[in-house]
Amino acid sequence: MEKYKIDKIFKLLSKEIPHPKTELKYINQYTFLISVVLSAQSTDVSVNKATKNIFKIAKNPKEMVDLGEKNLKKFIKTIGLYNSKAKNIILLSIELIKKYNSKIPKEFDKLISLPGVGNKTASVYQNAILKLPRIAVDTHVFRVSNRLGIVKTKTADQTQLQLEKIIPKKWRKDTHHLLILHGICYLLNTKFQTSYYKIHLKC
C-alpha cells in the first residue's frame, strides 16, 4: 500500500483513538513484563484480574520466586496456558536475579533469551517501556493490518517486518495499540466498514 494511504488510515485511527496505550495494569517495569507474558492468548481483562492480587505480594523477581510456581498457578488458573506461564515466570525471575541483578535488560536479544519472552513480548516491552519504535504483532495486529490492506502477509513475523518497513516513523510508536484497540472497538461494528475500510480504498 502507498505510504500516503497508510498515513491517511493512521490519521483516521488516531482521531478515533487519540490516546492509544496498553490496557494492562502494572506497577513497574518488571510487573509490566510479567503482564505481557501472561497476556499471550489471553485477554487483558483476565490478566488484570489475576495480577491485581499477584502484584500485592510479588512485584519484583525475588518476591515472585518466593511466591513460587505452585502458588502462582493458583492466581492465574483462569488464564490460558497457566501451567507453562507460571513455570516460565519463575524461571524468568530467577534468571533476572542471577544475570541482571533483578533488572530487565534493554537489548532485544537479551529479552528474547528470557524464559517465556518471545518476539512479540519483547517488542511490546521495548515499545511501551523503552519508547522504541518497535511494532509488536499478535493475532489482532496481524488480522487488522491485513484486513485494512496495509500489508498482505501470512504470518506475524512477516507482518512485523513489513509494518516496520512501511509505517511512517511518526506512527510507529502507536501502531501496535492503534491496531489492537481498533480491532477491539470497531472490527465487528459496521462503522469499521464505512469509516475505515471503505474510505481507505477510495484514497
Walk through the language-model features, giving the residues of each.
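Catalytic cores of DNA base-excision repair glycosylases
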Residues: 2-203
